[in-house]
């Protein structure tokens, strides 16, 4: 596996990452996939999905394998589970418990990367940076609950900001 330094974080991440979106089967299946990723040298996992089954499977797999410290985990802020479905939101009354749930299900007190989830409009980026959502992100960073801050987007204009 080849590794690269991720931006200005100093983190060495594998060129191939583990997107855990499809880990909604059994815990045994998730453990097998996670172990295969580890054996291949993959060391970064992205957990954008708020579904409790996926989060629990991934967190329990890392705990079972004793490998939390070997992984760089991207946890998303703004990805929530409401009424049995995914909802993207900036409402802190929903964002905070969703992020706390992520930490709990991963059996950890920190995320290596706190990803501001799915920002595809420049106007939305500006609102986030000027509002309470950004304040919450800064608070998490200051307390060490997230080690580095990132942003997920599908828009090159937002990525360049």
Give the location of each predicted region:
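Glycine/proline-rich, positively charged
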Residues: 39, 87-161
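Active-site mouth loops of central-metabolism enzymes
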Residues: 16-29, 77-96, 122-126
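A generic "cationic amphipathic patch" detector
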Residues: 29-31, 58, 71, 86, ...
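Generic anion/oxyanion-binding catalytic loop in active/binding sites
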Residues: 19, 47, 84, 100-103
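N-terminal binding-site loop/beta-alpha segment at the start of enzyme catalytic domains
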Residues: 1-75, 136, 142
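Active-site beta-loop-alpha junctions enriched in small/polar residues
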Residues: 21, 48-50, 76-80, 116-119, ...
């Amino acid at each position: 596996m080849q590794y690269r330094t991720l931006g200005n974080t100093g983190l060495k991440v594998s060129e191939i990452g583990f997107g855990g979106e499809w880990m909604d089967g059994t815990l045994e299946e998730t453990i097998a996939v996670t172990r295969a990723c580890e054996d291949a040298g993959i060391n970064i996992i992205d957990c954008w999905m708020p579904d409790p089954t996926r989060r629990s499977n991934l967190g329990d797999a890392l705990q079972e394998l004793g490998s939390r410290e070997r992984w760089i985990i991207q946890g998303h802020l703004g990805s929530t589970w409401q009424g049995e479905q995914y909802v993207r939101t900036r409402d802190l009354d929903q964002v905070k418990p969703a992020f706390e749930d992520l930490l709990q299900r991963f059996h950890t007190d920190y995320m290596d990367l706190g990803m501001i989830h799915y920002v595809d409009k420049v106007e939305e980026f500006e609102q986030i940076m000027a509002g309470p959502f950004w304040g919450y992100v800064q608070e998490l960073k200051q307390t060490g609950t997230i080690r580095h801050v990132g942003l997920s987007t599908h828009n090159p204009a937002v990525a360049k900001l």
